[in-house]
């Protein structure tokens, strides 16, 4: 998300502007408009799931977003019903912070109990996750923060995971966009979802 700010404190128009500024800025830099959206947590947050507001899902759809990249609800993609009455959905891809490099490099921040660099723990998590993915055929997202993975032990761990993933014929190494495209074709929302009011919601 733009500047990793907490969007829960923004107005609807402010959040809409931030989303468009992010998509447009990345399109200008790369020549391609992003297909999806990640609201990754900040290392100083008390919560690990990033920041969304009640309007985020609908605003992302309005901006042409094809998927939301960091949902911790499952280890397979699933659909977020952003507007029940209008049957609006946004595809959610798996994310878990134990697979995110930022929580193993100078986290918490220096002066806040930092564990400094925990590359061995990061590799143990990644290696165990690969075993689980092979065994059960699920999806896992490895989040690599390039600025944290440039040198020494961190670079060695990055090289190791890249070799492990790309060298295994039983694993499909794909971008989030490719994963989203596959899931939407194999399990389209209009054929796989059964819209029902949640039992715990009060009926008007």
Language-model segments: residues:
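C-terminal domain-boundary segment and adjacent tail
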Residues: 67, 73, 79, 120-204
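Catalytic domains of cell-wall/extracellular-matrix polysaccharide-remodeling enzymes
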Residues: 6-95, 101, 149, 153-157
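A conserved mid-domain beta-alpha-beta active-site/ligand-binding segment of alpha/beta enzyme cores
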Residues: 89-128, 134
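Glycine-rich, often proline-containing surface loops adjacent to acidic residues and nearby aromatics
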Residues: 1-3, 36, 137-143
């Amino acid at each position: 998300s733009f500047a990793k700010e907490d969007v829960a404190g923004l107005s609807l128009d402010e959040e809409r502007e931030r989303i468009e500024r992010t998509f447009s800025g990345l399109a200008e830099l790369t020549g391609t408009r992003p297909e999806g959206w990640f609201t990754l947590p900040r290392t100083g947050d008390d919560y690990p799931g990033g920041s969304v507001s009640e309007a985020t899902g609908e605003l992302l759809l309005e901006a042409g977003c094809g998927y939301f990249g960091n949902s911790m609800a499952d280890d397979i993609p699933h659909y977020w019903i952003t507007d029940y009455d209008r049957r609006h959905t946004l595809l959610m891809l798996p994310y878990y912070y134990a697979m995110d490099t930022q929580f193993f490099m100078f986290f918490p921040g220096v002066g806040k109990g930092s564990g400094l660099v925990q590359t061995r723990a990061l590799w143990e998590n990644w290696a165990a996750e690969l075993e689980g993915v092979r065994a059960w055929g699920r999806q896992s997202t490895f989040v690599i923060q390039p600025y944290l993975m440039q040198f020494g032990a961190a670079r060695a761990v990055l090289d190791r995971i890249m070799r492990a993933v790309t060298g295994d014929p039983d694993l499909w190494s794909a971008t989030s966009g490719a994963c989203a495209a596959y899931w939407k074709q194999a399990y389209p929302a209009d054929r796989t979802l059964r819209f029902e009011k949640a039992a715990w919601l009060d009926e008007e």
